[in-house]
C-alpha cells in the first residue's frame, strides 16, 4: 500500500508541475548576465537608436545572444563583426522606442504589450546571413524542449512606411496583390526547421497595424523557433521591403497546448482572400485558380 501511495503521489506531482512561461523582457541580459541597458542619444534618421539596447552594434562576443527569464529564452543577435558588413546587425535587439517615425527600431504601437515606451523585441531578418550560414539569422532557443503556445507580432515602423508609401531605399508601396509574410518554424538541435506556420504582416491590401496574437500550438514540441520573412517586392539585388518586425509576449508550455488564440481589442489581423500554401519550404499564392511564386511569377504546381 505504501508503494502504491508513493506512485500516486509522484503522478500527482508530475501533473501539477506543468508550467507556462512567458518571455519577460525586464529580465533581459547579455551572455554574461549584464543587464540590458538602453541608449539615450544614439544614431540619426531611420537608424535613431535612442531607447534601443546600447550594445546593438557591439562587436563583443558576449552580445551574440540576448537572454531572458534566466536564460530560458535565448535570442540570436549578430553584431557588426559577425553580420554582413561593418557597423550593422541582424537577428534580434530590444527597443523602447515610443514614436512611430519610420525608425527601424520602432513599431506602430509605440511600445510593447505593457504600453507605450515599454520594451519589445525588434527582429531584423537577413536573407544574406541566412543563405550563408544555412539557417535563419533570427533564432530563439529554449533551455529545454517546450510546446510553443503563442506570440504577439506587430508591424515595424520602417517596414510600414515602406509598404505604405515607398521611398525607403528601393522599396515601393504595396498594392492588393502584394504580401509580406513572417514564417515561424519549430527547429531541432541543428536549427533545421521541422514544422512551420505563416503570419501575414500584409496581404490583400490589408496591413498589420498593432499587436496581434499568433497561435503557435501547431508547431509542437521544440527546442526553439526560427523566424524568416518573404515579400513580393523583389528587385535585382533581392528583397526590397525592409525585413523588420516586432515581437513580444512569447509564451511556451511544458505540456501540450490547444489553440489559445483570442481576440485583442483595437488590433486587426489581415484577413486573406487569397489562399497561401507552403510546399517544401517555398511559399506560393493561389488566386482564382492561378499559382504564383512570392516573386509574382506564374508557375504550374499540383496541390
Specify the residue positions occupied by each region the protein language model found.
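Short coil-to-beta strand junction motifs in C2/discoidin
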Residues: 162-182
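N-terminal targeting leaders for non-cytosolic proteins
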Residues: 20-135, 143
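Sec-dependent N-terminal signal peptides
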Residues: 3-15
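Residue-level detector of functionally pivotal "anchor" positions at catalytic/ligand-binding pockets or at interdomain
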Residues: 254-286, 298-299
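Terminal, low-complexity interaction segments
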Residues: 23-29, 176-257
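Short, glycine-anchored, charge-dense loop/turn motifs used at functional sites
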Residues: 291-297
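Boundary of Sec targeting at the N-terminus
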Residues: 18-20, 297
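Extended extracellular/luminal ectodomain segments enriched in beta-structured repeat modules
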Residues: 143-150, 221-222
Amino acid at each position: 500500500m505504501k508503494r502504491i501511495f508513493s506512485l500516486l503521489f509522484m503522478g500527482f506531482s508530475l501533473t501539477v508541475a506543468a508550467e507556462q512561461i512567458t518571455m519577460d523582457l525586464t529580465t533581459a541580459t547579455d551572455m554574461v548576465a549584464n543587464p540590458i541597458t538602453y541608449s539615450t542619444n544614439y544614431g540619426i534618421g531611420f537608424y535613431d537608436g535612442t531607447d534601443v539596447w546600447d550594445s546593438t552594434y557591439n562587436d563583443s562576443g558576449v552580445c551574440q545572444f540576448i537572454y531572458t527569464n534566466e536564460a530560458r529564452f535565448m535570442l540570436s543577435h549578430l553584431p557588426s563583426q559577425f553580420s554582413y558588413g561593418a557597423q550593422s546587425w541582424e537577428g534580434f535587439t530590444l527597443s523602447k522606442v515610443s514614436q512611430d517615425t519610420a525608425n527601424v527600431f520602432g513599431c506602430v504601437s509605440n511600445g510593447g504589450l505593457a504600453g507605450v515606451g515599454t520594451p519589445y523585441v525588434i527582429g531584423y531578418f537577413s536573407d544574406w546571413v541566412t543563405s550563408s550560414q544555412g539557417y535563419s539569422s533570427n533564432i530563439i532557443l529554449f533551455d529545454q524542449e517546450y510546446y510553443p503556445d503563442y506570440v504577439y507580432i506587430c508591424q515595424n515602423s520602417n517596414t510600414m512606411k515602406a509598404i505604405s508609401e515607398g521611398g525607403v531605399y528601393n522599396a515601393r508601396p504595396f498594392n492588393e496583390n502584394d504580401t509580406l509574410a513572417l514564417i515561424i518554424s519549430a527547429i531541432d538541435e541543428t536549427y533545421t526547421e521541422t514544422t512551420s506556420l505563416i503570419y501575414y504582416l500584409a496581404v490583400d491590401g490589408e496591413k498589420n497595424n498593432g499587436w496581434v496574437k499568433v497561435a503557435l500550438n501547431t508547431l509542437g514540441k521544440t527546442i526553439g523557433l526560427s523566424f524568416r520573412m518573404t515579400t513580393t517586392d523583389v528587385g535585382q539585388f533581392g528583397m526590397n521591403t525592409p525585413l523588420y518586425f516586432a515581437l513580444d509576449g512569447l509564451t511556451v508550455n511544458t505540456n501540450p497546448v490547444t489553440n489559445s488564440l483570442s481576440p485583442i481589442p483595437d488590433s486587426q489581423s489581415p484577413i486573406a482572400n487569397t489562399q497561401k500554401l507552403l510546399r517544401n519550404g517555398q511559399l506560393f499564392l493561389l488566386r482564382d485558380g492561378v499559382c504564383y511564386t512570392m516573386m509574382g511569377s506564374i508557375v504550374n504546381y499540383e496541390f
